[in-house]
A protein has these predicted regions:
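Conserved, mostly hydrophobic/aromatic
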Residues: 16, 30, 37, 79, ...
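His/Asp/Glu-enriched, well-ordered alpha-helical/loop segment
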Residues: 6-9, 13, 53-138, 154-155
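Short, electropositive alpha-helical surface patch
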Residues: 30-40, 190-194, 198
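Active-site glycine- and acidic-residue-rich loops that bind
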Residues: 45-48, 114-116
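Active-site microenvironment of metallo-dependent hydrolases
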Residues: 105-211
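Short, acidic/turn-prone active-site loops that include or flank metal/cofactor-
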Residues: 41-46, 69-71
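Histidine/acidic residue-rich metal-binding segments in metalloenzymes
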Residues: 1-36, 47-64
Length: 211
């Protein structure tokens, strides 16, 4: 973190991902810079790279969001993993839920609003029309008091039937509106094979060089 500060890259527009090894000194630097942190719990746990110090970050008043470095695409599953991570690190079976809800609903909206220069994360005049519709059937009482718990515990991405971004419907009835998924699949599969071949060839060339 000190190196980033010395290089002049820590600004209110900076996003610091993971931060599993950051200490109190580093967090104080981040707080003073106005930078934000994004926790990526599924990737961190999968790669055994440690856990983001969520409680310390929030205590210091640093803006914290939750996301993924492409390991996961379902943010509700990421939120569930974040909750498990927090309870494990705290050693308390009842800890973490208020923090996860705050990160998911408030932290992400604050970061996105600042990044894109428009209110995000609310339904009101002048805000970005970013809306999803979930086909969710609650099996316990659902009210304004426990909506966040139903979202995090009860829902998952496969229940999303409509996605709208900036007023444009991108998915309707679980089908993309702007592209054909079969064509995308063929293109991404071919691109992945080309990438793998290129990486393998580069690795072989390096081995030959060192031999």
């Amino acid at each position: 973190v000190q190196r980033l500060q010395n290089a002049g890259v820590l600004t209110p527009d900076s996003l610091l991902a993971h931060c599993t090894y950051v200490d109190d000194v580093g967090l104080d630097i981040i707080r003073r810079s106005g930078s934000s942190i994004v926790n990526c719990p599924e990737s961190d746990l999968f790669n055994s790279t440690g856990c983001c110090p969520v409680f310390k970050i929030l205590e210091k008043g640093i803006t914290l969001g939750i996301g993924s470095d492409s390991y996961a695409a379902d943010m509700l599953e990421v939120a569930k993993m974040s909750l498990s991570e927090l309870r494990h690190t705290a050693g308390l079976p009842n800890a973490g839920f208020p923090e996860v809800a705050r990160i998911l609903f408030d932290g992400n909206a604050k970061i996105a609003s600042r990044t894109f220069g428009i209110p995000i994360g609310r339904i009101q005049k002048g805000a970005a029309a970013d809306i999803i519709i979930m086909d969710y059937i609650p099996y316990t009482p659902l009210s304004a008091v426990n909506t966040d718990r139903h979202i995090i515990f009860g829902m998952s991405g496969h229940e999303c039937v409509m996605t709208m971004a900036a007023g444009r419907v991108l998915m309707r009835n679980r089908r993309l509106t702007f592209a054909r998924e079969d064509i995308l699949s063929r293109k991404t599969t071919a691109a992945a094979e080309d990438l793998w071949q290129s990486v393998n060839q580069d690795a072989q060339n390096r081995l030959l060089h060192y031999e």
